[in-house]
Amino acid sequence: MAVPRANTSKARTRRRRGVNMRLQAPNLVECSGCGNLIMPHHVCPKCGFYKGKQVINPDKLD
C-alpha cells in the first residue's frame, strides 16, 4: 500500500483547497430606468425602478 513520504505542509494543503474558495464578482445588470448597474432582483437606488415600474421615490430616501 502506498504511503506518503512526508506530511503535507499547511501551506500546500491550504493552497490546494484555496483554489475552490475564490471569491466571485457579483452579477450586475443594467437598470431599465436609468442604465445604472444594479444587482438582479433589486430596486435601483438611483431611480427607484424595479421590473420597468417605479416602486419607490428615490428623493424620499435622502
Curated annotation (Swiss-Prot):
Single GO term (MF): structural constituent of ribosome
InterPro entries assigned: Ribosomal_bL32 (IPR002677), Ribosomal_bL32_bact (IPR044957), Ribosomal_zn-bd (IPR011332)
Signal peptide segment: none
Keywords in alphabetical order: Ribonucleoprotein, Ribosomal protein
Gene Ontology BP, a term: translation
Keyword Ribonucleoprotein listed: yes
One of the record's GO cellular component terms: large ribosomal subunit
A Pfam family annotated for this UniProt entry: Ribosomal_L32p
Matching HAMAP family: Ribosomal_bL32 (MF_00340)
Cross-referenced NCBIfam families: rpmF_bact
Family, similarity comment: Belongs to the bacterial ribosomal protein bL32 family.
This protein's name: Large ribosomal subunit protein bL32
Source organism (scientific name): Treponema denticola (strain ATCC 35405 / DSM 14222 / CIP 103919 / JCM 8153 / KCTC 15104)
